[in-house]
């Protein structure tokens, strides 16, 4: 009986270790994805601001 208990305990420990590794892996991926998303959002906002500024300048020049 103690041999079966040892095998079951070892199996449970392996499952816990595997699950913790998977959670850590996907957490790291989520953090990297969020950083990329934030960086791209900042760049897009900057590009949109530049386009708006150019359009305003173009209208001002056309008005002259």
Curated annotation (Swiss-Prot):
Periplasmic side: 25-64
UniProt keyword annotations, A-Z: Cytolysis, Disulfide bond, Host cell inner membrane, Host cell lysis by virus, Host cell membrane, Host membrane, Membrane, Signal-anchor, Transmembrane, Transmembrane helix, Viral release from host cell
Residue ranges crossing the lipid bilayer per the database entry: 4-24
Membrane topology listed for this record: Single-pass type II membrane protein
One Pfam family of this chain: Phage_lysis
Membrane-side (Cytoplasmic) residue stretches: 1-3
UniProt cross-references to InterPro entries, sorted A to Z: I-spanin
UniProt subcellular location: Host cell inner membrane
UniProt subunit comment: Homodimer; disulfide-linked. Interacts (via C-terminus) with RZ1 (via C-terminus). Part of the spanin complex which spans the entire periplasmic space. The spanin complex is composed of spanin, inner membrane subunit and spanin, outer membrane subunit.
Purpose: Component of the spanin complex that disrupts the host outer membrane and causes cell lysis during virus exit. The spanin complex conducts the final step in host lysis by disrupting the outer membrane after holin and endolysin action have permeabilized the inner membrane and degraded the host peptidoglycans.
UniProt record similarity statement: Belongs to the lambdalikevirus i-spanin family.
The protein, known as: Spanin, inner membrane subunit
Lineage: Viruses, Duplodnaviria, Heunggongvirae, Uroviricota, Caudoviricetes
Gene designation: Rz
